[in-house]
Amino acid sequence: MAGLDLGTAFRYVNHQLHRPDLHLHHNSSSDDVTPGAGMGHFTVDDEDNNNNHQGLDLASGGGSGSSGGGGGHGGGGDVVGRRPRGRPPGSKNKPKPPVIITRESANTLRAHILEVTNGCDVFDCVATYARRRQRGICVLSGSGTVTNVSIRQPSAAGAVVTLQGTFEILSLSGSFLPPPAPPGATSLTIFLAGGQGQVVGGSVVGELTAAGPVIVIAASFTNVAYERLPLEEDEQQQQLGGGSNGGGNLFPEVAAGGGGGLPFFNLPMNMQPNVQLPVEGWPGNSGGRGPF
């Protein structure tokens, strides 16, 4: 029965069962039992059960070797039980970790709101803050009341005027740079309004005592470049040619004590150079406040 088709056999048996002249009887006597009669009478339900059982064997892989056809289609069972490929649904919607910047750029400007308490020197407080934090401070504005103000007015031929009493701050601007910046790079300009409506202003050269809470709006930075303008022709040629100083002194003009001005340099505030920067070459140092 190796080449027997199950479908053809089923149709043949079904046709034989529906013949009126053919009847299958079960012989109960043990003497007439044939080798094939032990299965009982053959019906359509038995054929359906056999087909269903064989279909289950084919789907499950047919590893028991019950029939040649079931074993030949063993690979089809693997396709039925295989996991689907690709991402599981919803895997792309998982929350991503936030991006955290742990290091700040040296060229970043930071905004500050500085509050000076009553009785303190506003100029000295801001200068000390810039020196300890090793950051350059650019004062944008200020508000509050001050007393005992010493200012220098350009219209009075550099005379220093000391104002007694309480004054309201109208405008406050300036810059504070820690070393190695020269003292001339630090200055503070203020305009005040008196109790009788008078307005006076100038560069702060002495004490600027706060008569109450003084709020200073400022921005800070760490990367500073000092340059002397206008640029000379030889300096422009050196910059165009890539520079010819070699690996010698980083500040040749400063070390030699010449009056050519400060060369370009760009150093972090926490790096102290090994040379002394000239102070006399900067204008406005004679009438200003002393260094930090």
UniProtKB/Swiss-Prot annotation:
PROSITE patterns: PPC. Signal peptide: none annotated. GO terms for cellular component: nucleus. It comes from the Eukaryota. Residues 82-94 bind DNA. Residues 60-79 have a biased composition (Gly residues). SUPFAM superfamilies: AF0104/ALDC/Ptd012-like (SSF117856). Keywords: DNA-binding, Nucleus, Transcription, Transcription regulation. GO terms for molecular function: minor groove of adenine-thymine-rich DNA binding. Residues 23-100 are annotated as: Disordered. The PPC domain mediates interactions between AHL proteins. Transcription factor that specifically binds AT-rich DNA sequences related to the nuclear matrix attachment regions (MARs). This is AT-hook motif nuclear-localized protein 23. It comes from Arabidopsis thaliana (Mouse-ear cress). The lineage of its organism: Eukaryota, Viridiplantae, Streptophyta, Embryophyta, Tracheophyta.
